[in-house]
Regions:
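Conserved PLP-anchoring active-site segment centered on the Schiff-base-forming lysine
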Residues: 89-111
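Structural loop-to-beta junction motif characteristic of Rossmann-like glycosyltransferase folds
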Residues: 95, 115-119
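Short acidic capping loops at alpha-helix termini that bridge into adjacent secondary structure
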Residues: 67-73, 93-96, 143
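Short glycine-rich anion-binding loops that position phosphate/pyrophosphate groups of nucleotides
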Residues: 18, 80, 104, 151-155
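N-terminal small-domain helix-loop-helix segment of the aminotransferase-like
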Residues: 1-78, 85
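Active-site phosphate-binding strand-loop segment of PLP-dependent enzymes
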Residues: 119, 123-190
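Helix C-cap/helix->beta junction micro-motif
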Residues: 6, 114, 174-175
């Protein structure tokens, strides 16, 4: 922000915020649907079953993962809500989370609201933008609860391989961490 204020042209790679309007068909459908009396009623907290079944089917087809739509899928309003829910479920004030730099600002923003300690680990070009297990080992603490990763990564575009992902899983298991791969760009960058 200081560099922008000084007149430097800065490209913000922090959040993928769309700057185009939704397609006309989507807008027209939303307008039409909003006129239904059911549209203003409260929806089930866990979403409608048809949506959760659809998500479960998609995960099976795309990732070869079986999810129970009744107990393992919770549709949310967006990633910020999901990040907050994960922090609320797995952390207490004073706990530590490991966050990539560069990375999604919502990880730290949510953590700050909840009184968590944020420890950043660097994603470096010399390591193909992958999390370094050696660096993570130096940063992990006794009260560390979550390791956030983001692959395919934004803003770097790095795609994690099976070996690197296996290394991250083993590191998380060894250190009793919840490993969260925030994966919003899986269908765009893979």
């Amino acid at each position: 922000k200081k560099m922008q204020a000084a007149g430097n042209d800065i490209l913000n790679l922090g959040i993928g915020s769309p700057d185009i309007a939704a397609p006309k068909l989507v807008i027209d459908t939303l307008k039409e649907t909003a006129s239904h009396k059911e549209a203003s009623q409260y929806q089930p907290y866990n979403g409608i079953a048809a949506l959760r079944i659809g998500f479960s089917d998609w995960y099976r087809r795309v990732f070869d993962v079986t999810l129970d739509y009744e107990t393992e899928i919770l549709p949310l309003l967006g990633s910020k809500e999901a990040v907050m829910h994960i922090h609320l479920a797995f952390c207490n004030p004073g706990d530590t989370i490991l966050v990539p730099n560069p990375g999604y600002p919502a990880y730290a923003a949510s953590a700050k609201l909840l009184g968590l300690t944020i420890v950043y680990y660097d994603l470096e070009e010399s390591n193909n933008w992958m999390a370094s297990i050696d660096q993570l080992q130096q940063k992990v603490t006794r009260n560390c609860k979550i390791l956030w990763v983001n692959y395919p990564n934004m803003p770097t575009g790095a795609v994690v391989g099976k070996k690197e992902l296996s290394d991250l899983v083993n590191f998380a298991k060894h250190n009793n961490l919840l490993l969260v791969n925030d994966n919003p760009y899986s269908m765009v960058l893979n």
